[in-house]
């Protein structure tokens, strides 16, 4: 355990200015980031008598091996830098307000000619407007189904829209008046966009105006004796009122605000946030954060309050709204939709309330108020959110108790069954997927403490063991194993070279051939040997290197041949501290290298259940990547081969000319009429389509090398139309140890 006095800065070297500091452990990892009005006062508090420090702070300073700081001009700048560093380094001793799931939102693709409404989970995209988040996807679908009779906008995918446009008939929603059927020209693009804009206005809270307009149209239709239209409008008004009933008014003044509440114990804190727009609750989200290893700057806590809640509130505000502003900025939403409301209601004000309020105002672009509700509707709503937070914490503790017990039992059972030195806290599993030797891919999934660590998942495109319609599953397992562990050995070699003062010619984490989420190769940069834990950290960033941590248990999906192949690779690389097993399907036998008979785990054991989940997750991940790779190959376009021609400009070309066949007949001058297409690009397009003989000066956009495009044959393209499936051949994709199909 490091002694804080060994890395304490010399007296007088710490400035008294405001700034941000970070503690690193002996391996260079950033473990805590904090800010202070006076760096000297704050940092000196960490180097007091260790026995007088709070237990969480004591754990942090005894884990750290060094401290660094950066001086800033203002406290608001310190707040921004602290947020950026926490986001970049993900320190283990900082509270991280991250959702434990991706909440569904209602997305409106305003960047398309015919905007689409759909339920969405995932990163924000430019030109798409989002409403939510919501707790359940079914709630969005129920409301959307109710509103489609009033706002019959498109909800189908691009493929469905194109198909019905080609056949000239609308889908079922078009026949039952829940879609205006722009695919068959029932409404124009401008009319359809007006419908979508009215829908967005309704969800944004501008409801009274829309209801009054419908009522006026209903009255006019009635006066004109058009009772059928009047009855339909009457039903539309009723549908809107039912939708409004689902969102009861909670703040009578039509306030736009977020209401946050916290429920804490000694180890964890539950956070609940209600998003109120136009006086109605439009969304809700909640999560639980760990406090067991989190440091609170007790010197900054009001001793009279005797609580760490103000610091938790400050960390929540900076992290949560920093992420929201970043997402809204990436989505290029309208002004005022930065994700930061005009008012944020919190249980207590943060210590630096004025600076936090100024920072939030900068994110929004207009004034933001931080308030503690004292009476009335806002106080009542805050109490409701607080009850939700307390209930969420209680439910989380109940689930965690049962889940932690079962995971501990599973890991201990695996250790005993396989006679391991310690419980396999990190398990990696590899699986192979292909269709009759084509599009051969592999997946590698990672479980830590019995839970999936999806940020460490990796894809591989098999190269050496596949090709020309052949596939050797055993050789594929060996290839993936070699590439995975060569990467680790290379990191060891890089660290040793850096320690020896090697120059920048050595391999780095980004050069050479690397494992990526697609299909990178591996090159060896190390000399094998036992795995060194210090190789796991990039000294430049303090963050873990990709694939740097070795597993305690390496699982292959298969039987004795696959296990023998993986074990032989590890022996070849000199790796001795990684256990290898194989899990065969059907009988669920656990194969160990060098053993003639498999290990049989009880069918009802938690250990077998954990291994099955790991294996099935690898199988799912491999098949997902295989399908994606196969789909890209089967829907390839001749334009894909034009270097420098991206997806946006490809779509612009096809939209302008109508098809690849017509594009092929166009001249260079006609192609350059498309915005963003220059002469060199136009020549490269015609060369790729085989419209003229390829020449050296049109090899690609901005490329002086010889032509690499060439005409695309029917074998690759399969059709003149871009990105149209050309058919599916062979049986469904199969895994290395399951030949019965993808599923």
Swiss-Prot record:
Q: Which residues form the UVR domain?
A: 208-243
The subcellular localization recorded is: Cytoplasm
Alphabetically sorted, this entry's keywords are:
Cytoplasm, DNA damage, DNA excision, DNA repair, Excision nuclease, SOS response
Stored Pfam families:
GIY-YIG, HHH_5, UVR, UvrC_RNaseH, UvrC_RNaseH_dom
**Where in the sequence does UniProt note compositional bias of the Acidic residues kind?**
506-520
| Region entry Disordered, spans | 497-543, 694-743
Question: Which GO biological process entries does UniProt record here?
Answer: nucleotide-excision repair; SOS response
Answer yes or no on keyword Cytoplasm. yes
Per the record, its GO cellular-component terms are: cytoplasm; excinuclease repair complex
Please list the residue ranges that the record marks as compositionally biased, kind Polar residues: 734-743
Task: Identify the residues that the record assigns to the GIY-YIG domain, covering every copy.
Answer: 16-95
Q: What is its main location?
A: cytoplasm
Q: Which family does it belong to?
A: Belongs to the UvrC family.
How is this protein organized at the quaternary level? Interacts with UvrB in an incision complex.
The entry's function note states: The UvrABC repair system catalyzes the recognition and processing of DNA lesions. UvrC both incises the 5' and 3' sides of the lesion. The N-terminal half is responsible for the 3' incision and the C-terminal half is responsible for the 5' incision.
Q: What is this protein called?
A: UvrABC system protein C
């Amino acid at each position: 355990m490091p002694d804080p006095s060994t890395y304490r800065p010399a007296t007088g070297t710490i400035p008294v200015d405001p700034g941000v500091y970070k503690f690193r452990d002996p391996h260079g990892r950033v473990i805590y980031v904090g800010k202070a009005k006076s760096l000297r006062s704050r940092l000196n508090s960490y180097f007091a008598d260790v026995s007088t420090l709070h237990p969480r702070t004591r754990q942090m300073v005894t884990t750290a091996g060094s401290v660094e700081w950066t001086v800033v001009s203002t406290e608001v700048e310190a707040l921004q830098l602290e947020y950026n560093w926490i986001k970049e380094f993900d320190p283990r001793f900082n509270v991280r307000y991250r959702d434990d799931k991706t909440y569904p939102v209602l997305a409106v693709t305003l960047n398309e000619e015919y905007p689409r409404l759909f339920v969405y989970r995932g990163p924000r995209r430019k030109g798409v407007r989002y409403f939510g988040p919501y707790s359940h996807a079914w709630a969005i679908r129920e409301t959307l189904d109710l509103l489609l009779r009033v706002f019959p906008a498109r909800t189908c995918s691009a493929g469905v829209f194109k198909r019905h446009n080609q056949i000239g008939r609308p889908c079922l929603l078009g026949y039952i008046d829940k879609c205006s059927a722009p695919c068959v020209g029932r409404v124009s693009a401008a009319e359809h966009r007006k419908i979508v804009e009215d829908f967005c206005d309704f969800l944004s809270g501008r409801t009274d105006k829309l209801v009054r307009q419908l009522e006026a149209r209903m009255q006019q239709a009635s006066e004109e004796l058009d009772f059928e239209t009047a009855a339909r409008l009457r039903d539309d008004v009723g549908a809107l009122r039912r939708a409004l009933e689902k969102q009861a008014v909670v703040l009578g003044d039509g306030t736009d605000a977020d209401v946050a509440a916290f429920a804490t114990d000694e180890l964890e804190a539950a956070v609940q946030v209600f998003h109120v727009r136009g006086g109605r609750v439009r969304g809700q989200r909640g999560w639980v954060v760990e406090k067991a290893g989190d440091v609170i700057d007790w010197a900054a806590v009001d001793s009279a309050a005797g609580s760490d809640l103000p610091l938790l509130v400050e960390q929540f505000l900076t992290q949560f709204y920093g992420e929201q502003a970043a997402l809204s900025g990436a989505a290029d939403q309208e002004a005022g939709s930065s994700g930061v409301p005009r008012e944020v209601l919190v249980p207590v004000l943060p210590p630096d309330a004025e600076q936090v309020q100024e920072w939030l105002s900068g994110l929004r672009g207009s004034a933001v108020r931080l308030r503690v509700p004292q009476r009335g509707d806002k106080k009542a709503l805050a109490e409701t959110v607080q009850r939700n937070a307390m209930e969420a914490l209680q439910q989380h503790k109940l689930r965690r108790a049962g889940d932690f017990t079962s995971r501990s039992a599973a890991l201990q059972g695996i250790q005993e069954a396989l006679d391991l030195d310690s419980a396999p806290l990190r398990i990696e599993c590899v699986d192979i997927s292909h269709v009759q030797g084509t599009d051969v891919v592999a997946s590698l999934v990672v479980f830590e403490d019995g839970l999936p660590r999806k940020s460490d998942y990796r894809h591989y495109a098999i190269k050496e063991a596949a090709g020309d319609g052949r596939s050797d599953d055993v050789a594929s397992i060996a290839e993936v194993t070699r590439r995975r562990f060569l990467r680790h050995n290379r990191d060891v070699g890089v660290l040793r070279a850096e320690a020896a003062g090697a120059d920048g010619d050595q391999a780095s984490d980004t050069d050479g051939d690397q494992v990526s989420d697609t299909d990178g190769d591996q090159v060896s940069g190390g000399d094998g040997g036992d795995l060194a834990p210090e190789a796991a950290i990039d000294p430049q960033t303090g963050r873990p290197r990709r694939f740097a941590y070795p597993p305690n248990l390496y699982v292959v999906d298969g039987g004795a041949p696959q296990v023998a192949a993986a074990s032989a690779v590890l022996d070849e690389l000199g790796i001795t501290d990684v256990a290898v097993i194989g899990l065969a399907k059907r009988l669920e036998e656990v194969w160990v290298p060098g053993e003639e008979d498999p290990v049989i785990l009880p069918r009802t054991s938690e250990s077998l259940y954990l291994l099955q989940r790991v294996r099935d997750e690898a199988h799912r991940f491999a098949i997902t990547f295989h399908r994606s790779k196969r789909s890209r190959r089967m829907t390839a376009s001749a334009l894909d081969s034009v270097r420098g021609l991206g997806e946006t400009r490809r779509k612009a070309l096809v939209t302008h000319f109508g098809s690849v066949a017509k594009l092929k007949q166009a001249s260079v001058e006609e192609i350059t009429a498309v915005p963003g297409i220059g002469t060199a690009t136009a020549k490269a397009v015609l060369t790729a389509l085989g419209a003229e003989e390829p020449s050296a000066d049109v090899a690609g956009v901005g490329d002086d090398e010889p032509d690499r495009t060439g005409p695309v044959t029917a074998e690759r393209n399969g059709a003149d139309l871009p990105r149209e499936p050309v058919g599916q051949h062979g049986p469904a994709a199969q895994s290395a140890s399951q030949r019965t199909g993808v599923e």
